[in-house]
């Protein structure tokens, strides 16, 4: 019967107020809700009560929303249908209406519904006997319906009785369509009886819920008689289903409806994946007509979507009413989504009663072990919400279709206890309920009181049931959030790494393009050499990348472990002995950590080291040990790998060095800023700075909390006494005096070190500041590369004296033999891709080397004589009777390793052309005074002279004017007063350390000479360059590709081109190795002209100087009466007098 006041197909807006106003109306015209439960006849039989218990056995698997009770008048419920957007609309039969019976043949139509009734059990009337089945047909139909009920739990009305199953076969279709539609029963309402043979239009909805689990009522007699023989076959078929369906937690299991057979089975495939929540309604809903049901079923045929039920959403807050047009549009949009939802594994299994339904329940539970079903929590508080929330819930459900929400497996014992409690309470309520109207009024009043309570409150029963479930769900949500946040961080890291890789690839492509352009200009030989260099570069880059990755991984692992350790410590509930405590930094040497350092060791050792640069290998399987406290001198020819190896040690690259060892490598000058040299040096000692800061912290803690040592948060693995001892050991109170002495020893004045800013110094002086910082820190390993290059003679002598007292590991790369003789006690000689170590200073090394060379020459001669005899025997007897012996000796000759002597390097040649002789004097200074304009006079009344046989060394502290005097000699500057007499035929050549930087590096040496000297013949240029070691293919190479020493040779060759009578050499040894310096000394001694030398290289001065001219600060020059070594000893005495005592 249609609703009053509403035409067919018409929809009305609904609201909570209208529903409340409609209570107490006539029951006959009441419209169906979206989820209308099947009425059940009220009886006193206990078998129906068992069915009710079965519906509560699985409350976590299928939530059931319950609608508010109201006394609706006839025709008023249709207005509410327009706002309800519920996907599931079960259809009841009219109360008291007799459906038209449909005949059924024996063994006939039940075959059509076999596949559709896989999982739907049939309820039995409470207190009544099960309906008998017709012969030949009804037995099989009942089995098919049982198959479909294995995954569809069916709730039972609260306080109501299960609906009976009428005779006849028309019930089959309704059961088929209840596969996925749980049907609740109204609380306390009277069930409407079903007539025999009545049609059920609800079959479409039931067919669409093919995979929702249905609990089965226990104890029905009819269940025992149902087809037991087919159970095993049905179980095998049901195990093949693999579609996961999420189910709300806390919802009560739906109850299958009963009714006659309908004709609409086409919607089974369409709604195979749709899960439909069902409301519980009052008993007035039972009177709704079947015509409106048919209209709603036609709308539901379009639904093909899995509708997950949101966790924690209200299941009972949907109001009664039919569907509106907007619901249909949303359903059409949702049909496109086909996302599988996770279903909870392992639902609660209870002991099943005997009978067919018990077997069906057992089969459905077996299949649940493969399907994880999230279950929704709920309570009575959910009943308040109305149809306005339906749209929000559907949107949330659509979002949840993209997210699988696994739920933990519930324990059987916990669920059993909670379900038994709930069933016992329900059974008590059902006994108290009667058939009269006063029962309905009492139930309505109870429901209204529950609606007035705040939503935050739930009934005690739900609290008891869901307490542990809620805790589990909160833990699960936190666990799900944690991996998401971690994955987001990993994604960010991966994204940043990917960007860096793309940038590197772009840079490589740009480099390749540039190289291709350069290759077009290069010859074949140069291209091949460049390709070899590229290969080596690629290998090195790969090694660097791998090293960076390893370092990053180690740092990340260390930081994570450290953070984890800090997070895990609960300082409030932990014993202080269990706290790891804070350690001092590795560069701080406290007594508390000396034991650990002694176990680790302070030596540096490496084996089988391979060192290479683009284009060639420097070291191959080299081994070396640097013992702590020893001082090593590193010698070898330029470009052989000395500086490269020192940098490798400083970077700890492929070389094992204990972490507590501080390694300092003085390579670059300090950056100029507003700090003074003294402050810059004091700030370099990190250990002293940390000790002073920690002393302040601990003394402050002592004042605030005298018992801080017992606070786990403040625990330290060292004491304040340890800090005091270390500060005393390093003379922290005398740090300023020590820093000042170092600066003064390196050439600074006491007045300027605390006033002048570092930015006001030149590069050479800032390099001295960097050296002073390293010496002040006193690292365990000090690495120096050509420390005397930027120092004057006085500073070199001071540095020698300072390093003589060095008690830690020292490795010095130096080309000054005198410095090595004074400082080191071991020599490491690099040659032929290997390292040889010698005990003693540089002179001892040279003696041992010469002895080894003579011994090797003798062995070489002996081997050559032996090989010559063997070769003569082979040649003589290869064709006679001793041919076999000759062949045997030939094989022996091939196995003999020939001894090879070190070849003399052709570049170790400096040959100045000899000038014609000129009568003296060539250059004479007579009462010469000089000073720059606006400055004080630098030189006063100079009376000096230079001839062709002069070999003079100018010495003095930096800044006294040695280079200025040399410019006056060359004529670059002119005297202020006095007179400089020069011979007219005299030619003078001056070498400056800055000339190397002024070379045109885009030219080859041959092109440079052609531009300087009016295009002389190429062969003449090559011959002249060969006299200074620029031979073979070097004259054809660009100057930019030459080493610093080779560039210096080009300058010397340029000076010698004019065949000068006097050579003025200002620091010519920079960039020259020891062998080249020796060659330069030999060339200068063989030169027949005059030589004036300015050099910090004591060995060169000692080899060539016949006169020592000392330039003093007062602008005078005097001839030192002794030798250079006598002058050096005098400098040493002066340095001792310069030391600040306090």
Swiss-Prot record:
Gene3D superfamilies with a match to the protein in the record: P-loop containing nucleotide triphosphate hydrolases
Protein residues bound to ATP: 636-643, 956-963
GO process terms (BP): regulation of translational elongation; response to differentiation-inducing factor 1; sorocarp morphogenesis
Keyword set includes Nucleotide-binding: yes
Entry's Gene Ontology molecular function annotations: ATP binding; ATP hydrolysis activity
Compositional bias ranges of the Basic residues kind: 249-261, 280-290, 377-387, 456-467, 485-496, 530-548
Disulfide bonding pattern of the chain: none
Family (UniProt): Belongs to the ABC transporter superfamily.
Protein name: ABC transporter F family member 4
Organism: Dictyostelium discoideum (Social amoeba)
Native organism taxonomy: Eukaryota, Amoebozoa, Evosea, Eumycetozoa, Dictyostelia
Gene for this chain: abcF4
């Amino acid at each position: 019967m249609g609703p009053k006041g509403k035409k067919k197909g018409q929809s009305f807006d609904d609201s909570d107020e209208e529903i409340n106003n409609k209570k107490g109306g006539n029951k006959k015209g009441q419209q169906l809700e979206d989820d209308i439960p099947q009425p059940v006849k009220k009886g006193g039989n206990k078998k129906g009560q068992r069915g009710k218990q079965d519906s509560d056995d699985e409350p976590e698997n299928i939530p059931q929303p319950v609608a508010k009770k109201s006394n609706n008048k006839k025709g008023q419920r249709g207005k509410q249908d327009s706002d309800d957007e519920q996907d599931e609309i079960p259809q009841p039969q009219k109360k008291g209406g007799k459906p038209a019976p449909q005949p059924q043949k024996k063994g006939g139509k039940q075959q059509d519904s076999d596949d559709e009734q896989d999982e739907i059990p049939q309820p039995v009337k409470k207190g009544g006997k099960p309906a008998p089945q017709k012969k030949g047909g009804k037995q099989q139909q009942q089995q098919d319906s049982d198959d479909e009920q294995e995954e569809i739990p069916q709730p039972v009305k609260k306080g109501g009785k299960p609906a009976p199953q009428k005779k006849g076969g028309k019930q089959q279709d309704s059961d088929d369509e209840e596969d996925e539609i749980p049907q609740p029963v109204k609380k306390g309402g009277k069930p409407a009886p079903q007539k025999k043979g009545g049609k059920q239009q609800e079959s479409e909805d039931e067919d669409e819920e093919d995979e929702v689990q249905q609990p089965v009522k226990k104890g029905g007699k009819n269940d025992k008689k149902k087809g037991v023989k087919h159970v095993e076959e049905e179980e095998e078929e049901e195990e093949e289903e693999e579609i996961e369906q999420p189910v709300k937690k806390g919802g009560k299991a739906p109850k299958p409806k009963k009714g006659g057979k309908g004709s609409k089975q086409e919607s089974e495939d369409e709604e195979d994946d749709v899960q439909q929540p069902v409301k519980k309604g009052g008993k007035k809903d039972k009177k709704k007509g079947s015509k409106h049901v048919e209209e709603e079923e036609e709308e539901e045929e379009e639904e093909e979507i899995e509708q997950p039920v949101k966790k924690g959403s209200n299941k009972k807050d949907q109001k009664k009413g039919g569907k509106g047009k907007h619901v249909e549009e949303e359903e059409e949009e949702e049909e496109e989504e086909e996302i599988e939802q996770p279903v909870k594994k392992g639902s609660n299994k209870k002991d099943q009663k005997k009978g067919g339904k018990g077997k069906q329940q057992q089969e459905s539970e077996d299949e649940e072990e493969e399907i994880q079903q999230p279950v929704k929590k709920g309570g009575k508080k959910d009943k308040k919400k109305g149809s306005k929330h339906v749209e929000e819930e559907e949107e949330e459900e659509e979002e949840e279709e993209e997210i699988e929400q696994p739920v933990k497996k519930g324990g059987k014992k916990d669920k059993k206890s909670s379900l038994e409690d709930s069933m016992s309470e329900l059974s008590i309520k059902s006994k108290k309920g009667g058939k009269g109207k006063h029962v309905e009024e009492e139930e309505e009043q109870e429901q209204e009181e529950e609606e007035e309570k705040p939503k935050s409150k739930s009934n005690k029963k739900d609290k008891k049931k869901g307490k542990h479930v809620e805790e589990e769900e909160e833990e699960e949500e936190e666990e799900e959030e944690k991996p998401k946040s971690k994955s987001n961080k990993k994604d960010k890291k991966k994204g940043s790494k990917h960007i860096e890789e793309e940038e590197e690839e772009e840079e490589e492509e740009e480099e390749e393009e540039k190289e291709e352009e350069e290759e077009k200009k290069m010859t074949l030989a140069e291209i091949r050499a460049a390709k070899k260099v590229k290969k080596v570069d690629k290998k090195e880059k790969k090694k660097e990348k791998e090293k960076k990755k390893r370092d990053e991984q180690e740092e990340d692992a260390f930081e994570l472990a450290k953070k984890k350790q800090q997070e895990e410590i609960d300082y409030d509930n932990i014993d202080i002995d269990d706290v790891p405590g804070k350690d001092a930094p590795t560069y701080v040497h406290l007594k508390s950590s000396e034991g650990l350092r002694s176990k680790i060791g302070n030596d540096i050792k490496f084996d089988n080291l391979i060192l290479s640069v683009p284009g060639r290998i420097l070291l191959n399987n080299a081994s070396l040990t640097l013992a702590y406290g020893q001082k090593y001198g590193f010698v070898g020819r330029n470009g052989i790998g000395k500086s490269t190896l020192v940098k490798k040690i400083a970077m700890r690259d492929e070389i094992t060095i204990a972490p507590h060892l501080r390694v300092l490598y003085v390579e670059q000058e300090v950056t100029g800023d507003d700090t003074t040299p003294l402050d810059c040096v004091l700030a370099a000692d990190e250990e002293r700075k940390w000790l002073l800061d920690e002393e302040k912290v601990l003394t402050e803690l002592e004042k605030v909390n005298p018992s801080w040592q017992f606070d786990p948060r403040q625990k330290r693995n060292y004491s304040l006494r340890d800090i005091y001892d270390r500060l005393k050991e390093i003379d922290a109170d005398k740090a300023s005096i020590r820093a000042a002495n170092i600066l003064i020893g390196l050439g600074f004045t006491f007045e300027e070190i605390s006033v002048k800013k570092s930015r006001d110094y030149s590069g050479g002086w800032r390099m001295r500041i960097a050296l002073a910082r390293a010496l002040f820190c006193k690292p365990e390993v000090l690495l120096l590369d050509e420390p005397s290059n930027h120092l004057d003679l006085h500073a070199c002598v001071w540095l020698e004296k300072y390093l003589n007292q060095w008690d830690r590991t020292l490795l010095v790369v130096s080309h000054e033999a005198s410095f090595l003789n004074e400082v080191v006690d071991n020599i490491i000689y690099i040659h032929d891709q290997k390292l040889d170590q010698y005990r003693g200073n540089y002179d001892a090394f040279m003696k041992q080397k010469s002895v080894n060379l003579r011994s090797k020459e003798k062995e070489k001669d002996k081997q050559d004589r032996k090989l010559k005899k063997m070769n003569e025997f082979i040649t003589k007897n290869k064709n006679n009777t001793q041919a076999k012996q000759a062949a045997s000796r030939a094989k022996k000759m091939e196995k003999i390793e020939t001894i090879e002597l070190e070849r003399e390097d052709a570049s170790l040649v400096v040959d100045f052309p000899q000038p014609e002789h000129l009568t003296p004097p060539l250059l004479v200074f007579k009462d010469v005074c000089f000073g720059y304009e606006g400055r004080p006079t630098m030189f006063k009344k100079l009376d000096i002279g230079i001839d062709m046989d002069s070999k003079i060394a100018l010495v003095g502290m930096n800044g006294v004017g040695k280079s200025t005097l040399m410019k006056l000699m060359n004529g670059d500057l002119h005297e202020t007063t006095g007179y400089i007499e020069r011979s007219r035929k005299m030619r003078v050549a001056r070498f400056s350390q800055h000339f190397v930087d002024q070379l045109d590096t885009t030219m080859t040496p041959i092109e440079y000479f052609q531009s300087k000297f009016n295009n002389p013949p190429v062969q003449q240029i090559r011959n002249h360059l060969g006299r200074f070691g620029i031979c073979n293919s070097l004259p054809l190479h660009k100057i930019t590709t030459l080493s610093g020493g080779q560039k210096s040779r080009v300058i010397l060759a340029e000076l010698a081109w004019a065949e000068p009578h006097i050579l003025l050499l200002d620091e010519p040894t920079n960039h020259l190795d020891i062998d080249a310096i020796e060659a330069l000394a030999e060339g200068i001694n063989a030169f027949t002209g005059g030589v004036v030398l300015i050099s910090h290289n004591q060995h060169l001065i000692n080899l060539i100087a016949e006169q020592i001219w000392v330039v003093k600060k007062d602008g005078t020059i005097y001839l030192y009466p002794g030798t250079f070594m006598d002058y050096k000893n005098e400098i040493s005495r002066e340095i001792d007098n310069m030391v600040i005592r306090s």
